[in-house]
Amino acid sequence: MDEFYKEALGQAKKSLSEGGIPIGSVLVYQNKIIGKGHNRRVQDGSVILHGEMDALERANRQPASVYKESIIYTTLSPCPMCTGAILLYGIPKVVVGENTNFMGAEDLLREKGVEVTVLHDPESIQMMKDFIQEKPELWNEDIGE
């Protein structure tokens, strides 16, 4: 398993251990993590801090050129909100742990020229499946249902 994806998975586990939704993400620039985060909606009472949004936030302000040369790793297929941020900042590549439990806006990313790689990671699939079964109300809230 790729070291960067491992860190994203570690962030997802951290969120779960905090009572949150197990989704993690890292933003990588020039082979270094510049931002890492996890879904903090439950922990912080936030309406927007999905894993990808938290990783972007924790990367702090960057010049546009940094985003245009970065890769974002996420344990779950990006929702429309996170997809919008990826497109807004021109991030050219997204590595997705799994899209079995939730298919985000991958088609839109591809349509806009973003390279999307799906790992079909069994650990991520099982972790999300278990979470959705155990806390369907939190999951539905997270995806706007």
Write out the residue ranges for each language-model feature:
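Local cysteine-cluster metal-coordination motifs and their immediate loop/turn environment
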Residues: 72-92
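Glycine/small-residue-rich phosphate/adenosyl-binding loop
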Residues: 35, 52-61
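Zinc-dependent deaminase
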Residues: 1-15, 87-145
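Short beta-strand scaffold segments in enzyme catalytic cores
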Residues: 23-31
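A short, polar/charged loop-to-alpha-helix boundary motif
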Residues: 43-53
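A short helix-loop-beta-strand connector motif used in the catalytic cores of GNAT acetyltransferases and
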Residues: 17-20
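Short beta->alpha transition motifs characteristic of CBS
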Residues: 34-41
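Short helix-loop-beta connector
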Residues: 65-69
